[in-house]
């Protein structure tokens, strides 16, 4: 079976730009923390990105060539599956930790050890010493199977991080014990809160560079206070200190190191024990009708077209009929293959990152931003009413008010589409002509293209490379 793995989350969409501060990738998304009603099934994120207000440079999309390998046998669902990822400031050691994790857990079976430069895969990333893409690796502990996303930490590419952050059931916040929390540490914690990452474990890295134990304790205290300030339970979150680099070097020298044989490798095991115990297995929305937002599309010669993404809800099996909804006319197709991590799957369920092979669909018929759904369960719409929070200047939002007729970008699931604000109502129900930064308002929005959306769905509003608002759909109008 040709591989239609969603381990292709080392996405084929590549962002390269000479001095790009505004990556233009649409974001994959998940719930934010605008709690407005308990009946919502939130899907879209509010993406709080504090990118510098520099002129938008010309970012070019370059597509990496796909190497399609044969599926390596069947995916066995023996353990509960959890999506996690590393977040934190640039050069604090996220990718190094990811490499150390895969190598330490390779002895558990089913986890291929990955070297640092295999995770930090693309040449542009290594050349600048900065991760620009999101790479997914898999590994297992005794109790669970993990899909791990390595998120970029560089401020210019925070936008690209969304693709990874939105797929997390929990996160490992990597913070250098030598430097303490930095601007992007804060940004990523805020972002995790907004895109609905429910739980977090902290790894204080570079412990070997801190001579004084008291300094490390001060950094730990600072991290706990920072987490509490963003409404995470800072006092309860497990914080493990260690050195990802020294652990990785020890594992490279001797891949069969067991627990108790090296203090730095033991810290990696200790971290995963904390992740196992502290990050709960998420309740999947498996009972609901199937829906998957398409993140990427590619062709396999002789087999057909594959759509990859994260199953948001429900289940899908080979032979199921699905609708392709949004951006163009809705059409139906049959799923002829389901794979995860280059292994054949009987059934994909909510939370899985999968590739679906679709019958009779050409690559040009389908694109990122569309959704695959159980027939008749979701329809494309262009007009809706939403409750929106407009970010203040201090939160990275607009400095000035906007008026009726305002045309920003609306980010929904994996798509971004221009929309026009046609009417403004205050939260007291009075009509208004103007929206100030910091306001909470009801807006009626008209999109220029139909998008699969529904009541309770969350979205972000962006303009000029920064997030200016966050909202949730109250009512579909047309």
From Swiss-Prot:
Record: residues binding GTP: 88-95, 150-154, 205-208
Region called G3, residue ranges = 150-153
Return the annotated region ranges for G1.
Answer: 88-95
Short name of one Pfam family: GTP_EFTU_D3
Cysteine pairs forming cystine bridges in this chain are none
> Where is this chain compositionally biased, Low complexity type?
1-29
Q: What is the annotated localization of this protein?
A: Plastid, Chloroplast
- Broad class of where this protein is predominantly found: plastid
What are this entry's molecular-function GO terms? GTP binding; GTPase activity; translation elongation factor activity
Tell me the leader sequence span.
none
Task: Spell out the HAMAP family in the cross-references.
Answer: EF_Tu_B
Output this protein's name: Elongation factor Tu, chloroplastic
In the UniProt record, the gene name given for this protein reads: TUFA
